[in-house]
Amino acid sequence: MGDMVVEPATLKPTSEPTPSPSGNNGGSLLSVITEGVGELSVIDPEVAQKACQEVLEKVKLLHGGVAISSKGTPLELVNGDGVDNEIRCLDDPPAQIREEEDEMGAGVASGTAKGARRRRQNNSAKQSWLLRLFESKLFDISMAISYLYNSKEPGVQAYIGNRLFYFRNEDVDFYLPQLLNMYIHMDEDVGDAIKPYIVHRCRQSINFSLQCALLLGAYSSDMHISTQRHSRGTKLRKLILSDELKPAHRKRELPTLSPAPDTGLSPSKRTHQRSKSDATASISLSSNLKRTASNPKVENEDEELSSSTESIDNSFSSPVRLAPEREFIKSLMAIGKRLATLPTKEQKTQRLISELSLLNHKLPARVWLPTAGFDHHVVRVPHTQAVVLNSKDKAPYLIYVEVLECENFDTTSVPARIPENRIRSTRSVENLPECGITHEQRAGSFSTVPNYDNDDEAWSVDDIGELQVELPEVHTNSCDNISQFSVDSITSQESKEPVFIAAGDIRRRLSEQLAHTPTAFKRDPEDPSAVALKEPWQEKVRRIREGSPYGHLPNWRLLSVIVKCGDDLRQELLAFQVLKQLQSIWEQERVPLWIKPYKILVISADSGMIEPVVNAVSIHQVKKQSQLSLLDYFLQEHGSYTTEAFLSAQRNFVQSCAGYCLVCYLLQVKDRHNGNILLDAEGHIIHIDFGFILSSSPRNLGFETSAFKLTTEFVDVMGGLNGDMFNYYKMLMLQGLIAARKHMDKVVQIVEIMQQGSQLPCFHGSSTIRNLKERFHMSMTEEQLQLLVEQMVDGSMRSITTKLYDGFQYLTNGIM
């Protein structure tokens, strides 16, 4: 199937009816829904036409109007600028309608007829205003999702499905979980309206395809496999994972093919099943190329080889373009599962380094990190920098990933592999090979069809046991090294206008910076992540870049990701969406609250990836490492009370604390111990781990009954109960709540749509949505809201249950 450029329908009201090109037989043009779209099959014109006819016929029958002709006469909504301002057939003159109305009204009192006409005109006016709304600049993606979810009229749903093409990709991507959940769990009319857009975007973006496939699988997991709705979601997922949605332009951009040596077609048997990279540029034209299923298993070397190439036209990529990326992700998940079986943090850390060292043997490859916001190829994982995070029962881990940014992931060649021990005598990019990776390098890349059901075949335990863990590399900085990284770090000092700064101010700021350099944490075998997380991000990037064989490349970037196995991140994704929406609302209303939503990738119902918050450590780690109170730690890190650094950090703390207090109140966030609250280098607090929100709580203990967590230590950092910053905190709380309730519908619909068909614990109980709406207090005046904020702050600060829960976490998990 080719990649079509879809021109979606426009819904423009007209002052006068437009005759149908097909005469009285109806034809295929339905200007309300499918203008300019019928030939491209975005929405089936006959389906949309029939839907609108049924809707309008129902309206006329209910209000004493004329039944629509059974011949399928096209209909058009008039925008209300005309005299009649009513819904009518395109080919029927208004006089005919009046004559038929007179006939139908025979024997009926004139008052009743006038009432029917008035109701019909009112309904026409409503239809006209709906059209005006859909075409106005006020109609944003949030309103489109709302109408798609709440409307019961197929014609409206079909139009909204077409309207999705007009919004920016990033705006629609934000609501992708809602769109796919509606596709899975709602009726066919909604699904039929959504599917054309999803298919079109999947042709355009491989990352969008991956996210759709993962979300469809995760949100279908709560349904019985035999149900029709589940099979419908499964069919779309299989379509995405197949090769049918691959962009057609790949066939036009094939590299030159040349026969490969025989050794390239007969790889030796090895434990790690490796096939040719999806970037293979040399394929034997005489080879027997077999087509494989969307997710086949490796049975032998011949099948593995044949699966690595589907046809000459498709040789630019793997037969299933998502297969290498899926193997990359599943390899990371398998590492987490194996780490969870080890008893100590030290053993987990050693095993993690060994596993990632093996993973590097398959890189570079046509794989990417889905949490990143730009196109790139993964080239290396600095395995010695990975750390295991704190968890009692599981083994989440943090890795850093070196990538090379590219313009287009699909068409850019996979970078050539550079050996770890290569002496980089030059930094010139021109000296690097421009072609794809060689045969030896391809042998170490990701198989396109791994056997996911047998970890021993995909990753050899024997190999891991024999692997010698590499020690951190020692590098000597050459002059060109220094010059390269100096250029990267220098910021432009040019300014259009001169800026005069007093010499005393410069001396004071320099002395403050030298006197209060951020402290480093000590290595703790029981908490190896503390040191890694405390290191400033820019320093980490510089250090890893200097030790990387790819670090000299100008498009080199460093990313990080947390891999979690055994945790359902669907609630985390829901919380991310709510936080992102609240952040947008507060920015729009100019309320200086600060929150930090971090990206979530749901891989399955029990695994996923999380974007780490850089330059931040947990309050638990702060207290354990420093043995100081929170206020004393602020003074140690940022200077005395009167320094500019401390005042800035204090303001950041207040603005972020107020923002997260409102988030915790609205979403009823639980499990708020100090291990789940981070403190960054600028003084902000960041709440993490939203596994218990709305109707769920840890082990249903019910410890945390306060509106949010506000401890005495937090108030001390703000300057005490009588301080100006504490009053500023309460003022921000009030302003933030007032702003949030102005846009309540935008927040509530995110949660309400995801409740459809969900078995998540946060939706247990029938009153989840009602209680969420009540927490916006729409009926209260601003004076009443101010009193409410005062009561919540006072109650949270004095809450005995918060102290009990902190004590419980200290006794059971050692969290300070």
UniProtKB/Swiss-Prot annotation:
Residues 687-711 are annotated as: Activation loop. The keyword Ligase does not apply. GO terms for molecular function: 1-phosphatidylinositol 4-kinase activity; 14-3-3 protein binding; ATP binding. Transmembrane segments: none annotated. Residues 668-676 are annotated as: Catalytic loop. The modification Phosphothreonine is found at residues 263, 438, 517, 519. Residues 541-547 are annotated as: G-loop. One of its GO terms (biological process) is phosphatidylinositol phosphate biosynthetic process. Its main location: membrane. Pfam families: PI3_PI4_kinase, PI4KB-PIK1_PIK. It is a peripheral membrane protein. GO terms for cellular component: Golgi apparatus; Golgi membrane; mitochondrial outer membrane; rough endoplasmic reticulum membrane. It is found in: Endomembrane system; Mitochondrion outer membrane; Rough endoplasmic reticulum membrane; Golgi apparatus. Its EC number is 2.7.1.67. The modification N-acetylglycine is found at residue 2. Disulfide bonds: none annotated. Keywords: Acetylation, ATP-binding, Endoplasmic reticulum, Golgi apparatus, Kinase, Lipid metabolism, Membrane, Mitochondrion, Mitochondrion outer membrane, Nucleotide-binding, Phosphoprotein, Transferase. Its cofactor is Mg(2+); Mn(2+). Residues 10-30 have a biased composition (Low complexity). Residues 52-242 form the PIK helical domain. Residues 278-297, 306-318 have a biased composition (Polar residues). Interacts with ARF1 and ARF3 in the Golgi complex, but not with ARF4, ARF5 or ARF6. Interacts with NCS1/FREQ in a calcium-independent manner. Interacts with CALN1/CABP8 and CALN2/CABP7; in a calcium-dependent manner; this interaction competes with NCS1/FREQ binding. Interacts with ACBD3. Interacts with ARMH3, YWHAB, YWHAE, YWHAG, YWHAH, YWHAQ, YWHAZ and SFN. Interacts with GGA2 (via VHS domain); the interaction is important for PI4KB location at the Golgi apparatus membrane. Interacts with ATG9A. This is Phosphatidylinositol 4-kinase beta. It comes from Mus musculus. The gene is Pi4kb.
